[in-house]
């Protein structure tokens, strides 16, 4: 309801909506979202900070139209979410990190990669500093993918 992305969308006159997932089975939630997306005649679904795994039925129904951003250079640290990924990067001693924008498939974080953005992991970096750097890259990566998508749609 109060997600920053919804506020930003409204600020740019982009139609957006919220569907509460609490106390709903995944399939029920996904059907409700799918219905709303069809009503809005949506062409592209962006998963930004979406901390849920979509059902196979939803992914199949919207195949080729769902894009996710993952806070690592996939396939490294696949399956992790948010700060856990940055902890894994530090624990592994990775020299670089970044983000991956990919098409969503039934297999989590295994869809075709559309864009990867990289940044160095510096001595003294923390989970917080990596999160900040990677989130900046995520925004850049999404813009790049959306612009490319628009060109291909025309």
Residue ranges and their predicted role:
Residues 1-154:
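One-carbon transfer enzymes
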């Amino acid at each position: 309801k109060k997600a920053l992305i919804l506020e930003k969308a409204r600020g740019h006159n982009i139609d957006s909506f919220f569907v509460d997932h609490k106390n709903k089975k995944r399939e029920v939630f996904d059907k409700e979202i799918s219905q709303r997306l069809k009503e809005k005649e949506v062409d592209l679904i962006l998963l930004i900070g979406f901390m849920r795994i979509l059902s196979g039925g939803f992914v199949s129904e919207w195949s080729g139209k769902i894009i996710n951003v993952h806070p690592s250079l996939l396939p490294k640290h696949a399956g992790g979410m948010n700060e856990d990924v940055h902890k894994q990067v530090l624990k592994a001693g990775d020299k670089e990190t970044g983000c991956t924008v990919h098409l969503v498939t039934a297999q989590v974080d295994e869809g075709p990669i559309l864009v990867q953005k990289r940044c160095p992991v510096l001595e003294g970096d923390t989970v917080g500093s990596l999160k900040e750097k990677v989130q900046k890259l995520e925004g850049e990566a999404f813009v790049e993918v959306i612009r490319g998508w628009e060109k291909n749609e025309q």
